[in-house]
C-alpha cells in the first residue's frame, strides 16, 4: 500500500495537513474548482520562481493565499509592484478579496517539489538523466536529509521504448506513518516526449516511536 499511494495523502491527519483550509456546505464543489483554477494559474504564472507549495485559506468573503517559494524576490518585484499585479489577476479568478503571503523556502534542496522541478529542468536542458538524479541526491543528503529516492519515467535518453529508472540513497520508509516524507512530482517536456520525475524525501521521524 505504502509503495503506491501518494505519501502526503497517506499521512493526512496524522503528521501532514491539508493545503486548502476552509469549510463549505452548498458551494463546496464551486470553491474546489476555484482552488484548482487558482493553483493552476499560479503554477503557470510563477513557473520560474521555484514555487514549492500553495496554501489557500478562506473566511467570510476573503481568500488568503500562502505561496512558498525559493525565489521570493521574483514574485514580490521592485517595491512590491509584481505582487500588486498578481493580486489583481487573482481577483479576476475569484469574487473574493485576495490576500497574498509570500514565504521563502530557506533550503530548496530539502523540498521534494523543488528537487523534482530541478531534475526536470536539467532533463529539458539535455543533461543525462542519471547524472541529474545523482547530482540532486548528493546535494539533498549534504543538506541533512535522511534519505531520498528519485524516479524518472519515460523515453529516457531518447530510447525507443519508455522505461522507469530510480536511484535511492539513505532510508525512505514508505509504510511508517510517523516518517516525515515529502513528495514532489514534475514533468520534463523533451523532444522525445514527456518524462515524469517523482521525488520522495525522508526528513526524519516526527512522532517519537512508542517504547
Curated annotation (Swiss-Prot):
Domain of life: Bacteria
Segments forming domain KH type-2: 38-106
InterPro entries assigned: KH_dom (IPR004087), KH_dom-like_a/b (IPR015946), KH_dom_type_2 (IPR004044), KH_sf_prok-type (IPR009019), Ribosomal_S3_C_sf (IPR036419), Ribosomal_uS3_bac-typ (IPR005704), Ribosomal_uS3_C (IPR001351), Ribosomal_uS3_CS (IPR018280)
SMART domains noted in UniProt: KH
Gene3D superfamilies: 3.30.300.20, Ribosomal protein S3, C-terminal domain
Gene name tied to this protein: rpsC
Keyword field: Ribonucleoprotein, Ribosomal protein, RNA-binding, rRNA-binding
PROSITE patterns given in the database record: KH_TYPE_2, RIBOSOMAL_S3
GO BP terms: translation
GO cellular component, one term: cytosolic small ribosomal subunit
Family: Belongs to the universal ribosomal protein uS3 family.
Record-level Gene Ontology MF annotations: mRNA binding; rRNA binding; structural constituent of ribosome
UniProt function note: Binds the lower part of the 30S subunit head. Binds mRNA in the 70S ribosome, positioning it for translation.
The UniProt record lists the keyword Membrane: no
Stated name of the protein: Small ribosomal subunit protein uS3
PANTHER family for this protein: 30S/40S RIBOSOMAL PROTEIN S3 (PTHR11760), SMALL RIBOSOMAL SUBUNIT PROTEIN US3C (PTHR11760:SF19)
SUBUNIT field: Part of the 30S ribosomal subunit. Forms a tight complex with proteins S10 and S14.
Amino acid at each position: 500500500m505504502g509503495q503506491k499511494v501518494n505519501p502526503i495523502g497517506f499521512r493526512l491527519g496524522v503528521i501532514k495537513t491539508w493545503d486548502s483550509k476552509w469549510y463549505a456546505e452548498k458551494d463546496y464543489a464551486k470553491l474546489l474548482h476555484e482552488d484548482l483554477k487558482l493553483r493552476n494559474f499560479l503554477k503557470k504564472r510563477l513557473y520560474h520562481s521555484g514555487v514549492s507549495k500553495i496554501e489557500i485559506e478562506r473566511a467570510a468573503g476573503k481568500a488568503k493565499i500562502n505561496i512558498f517559494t525559493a525565489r521570493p524576490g521574483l514574485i514580490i518585484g521592485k517595491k512590491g509592484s509584481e505582487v500588486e499585479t498578481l493580486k489583481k489577476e487573482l481577483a479576476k479568478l475569484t469574487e473574493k478579496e485576495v490576500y497574498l503571503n509570500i514565504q521563502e523556502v530557506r533550503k530548496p534542496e530539502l523540498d521534494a517539489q523543488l528537487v523534482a522541478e530541478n531534475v526536470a529542468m536539467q532533463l529539458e536542458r539535455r543533461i543525462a538523466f542519471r547524472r541529474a538524479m545523482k547530482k540532486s541526491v548528493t546535494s539533498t543528503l549534504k543538506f541533512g536529509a535522511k534519505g531520498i529516492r528519485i524516479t524518472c519515467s519515460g523515453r529516457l535518453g531518447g530510447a525507443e521504448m519508455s522505461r522507469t529508472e530510480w536511484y535511492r540513497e539513505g532510508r525512505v520508509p514508505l509504510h511508517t506513518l510517523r516518517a516525515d516524507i515529502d513528495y514532489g512530482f514534475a514533468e520534463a517536456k523533451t523532444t522525445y516526449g514527456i518524462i515524469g520525475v517523482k521525488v520522495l524525501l525522508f526528513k526524519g521521524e516526527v512522532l517519537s516511536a512508542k517504547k
